[in-house]
């Protein structure tokens, strides 16, 4: 896909997400509803389904929005949501007086277009892509085409994916900016762009990428499957959190207690997500 096509797709995805958000504006202070926003990996991977199940059981409506870790934490700070979802640990600048509660496991995965003949990548080659030392798919035994790299990033803080990428792959460093590196506002948009970009490459979370029409690359010959993550064969495992104010009301605490219960964790596991029960 050429740059103009990518831009048009981005605009379409952004407008569509805005329409969806406006169609379900939450009442963050209602007694019969809760609201959560944040990490796209959590939103796509388990949070929507969990919210529907919780409403079915309790009658409490949970309004769920994606938009990324940074946006979710900002909404929480500004009182626009009752809690937030994130796929990274706490960093400097995050809201104070909150708790990061781990609710599931995820793994950082590398994704490409379905048609891409490259099916495996080494951790070292992935690192070289982000440092602009590998710039063409031909260098990975693929076709002669530039590697178009997409990363979720905002101006306010580190996204969950980039934080994991820096900590687990890039030895604490930032990706090297170059003409083939594009920044997008959320991981959900990155995944949708990869679905449409034959030369695209990105890091994402297993929990959401498994539900997209993308090619999840093997890493050092190991497939990113739920079984391999549980058995600790696939590396780059990372936690998924819900971020809750320390002074949360009783309904928020009830929801957190449900998700941490054996029943809640079994429901998460049944969705195909790696639950806390799956990894001891």
Can you annotate each of these PLM segments?
Residues 5, 25-26:
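Short linear, low-complexity motifs centered on an aromatic residue
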Residues 9-23:
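Bacterial N-terminal signal peptides
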Residues 1-7:
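N-terminal secretory signal peptides that target proteins for export/translocation
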Residues 28-280:
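Exported/periplasmic ABC-transporter solute-binding proteins
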